[in-house]
Amino acid sequence: MSDRASELTRFPFHPLRNTILSAIAMTVLNIDTQPPFTTKDGSTIRSILDRTNAAVSHQSLAEASVPAGVTTQRHYHRQSEEFYYILEGSGRMNIGDETRAVVPGDAILIAPGAWHFITAEVALRFLCACSPPYSHDDTFLE
């Protein structure tokens, strides 16, 4: 038994007990085993780690793709803060009234409540991290 697990047996009501115990068992998932789905904004997503495939409660990580010439639908999330990390392609990111060019290596912060969309000039592939985890119910379209 790990040191963390043995210590938790002495404190059965520790506030982080379930979080720590779930972290003790390693979860490794390969993106190739995750089926793609389309989000409300029109992007194609493959969940890497989220509530649907792992013991995740506070965040999610997915790979998103947007074909060349396509713009996702303008939307916002009331609760989720998002990070995008551009892996491939190029495009334009719009948050509120600001638009910027994005290329591989760029990281983008999207605050809760911020209207946003992305346009792929060259097919985009990017990581999307959300906290709390992504939910269709927390996606509001224009």
Predicted segments, located by residue:
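A short, N-terminal "cap"/entry segment at the start of jelly-roll beta-barrel domains
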Residues: 11-58, 73, 139-142
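Conserved short histidine dyad/triad with adjacent acidic residue
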Residues: 62-77
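A cytosolic small-molecule/anion-sensing beta-strand core signal
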Residues: 87-88, 103-104, 122
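Short acidic-glycine-tyrosine-enriched beta hairpin
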Residues: 98-112
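Ligand-binding loop in jelly-roll beta-barrel domains
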Residues: 112-136
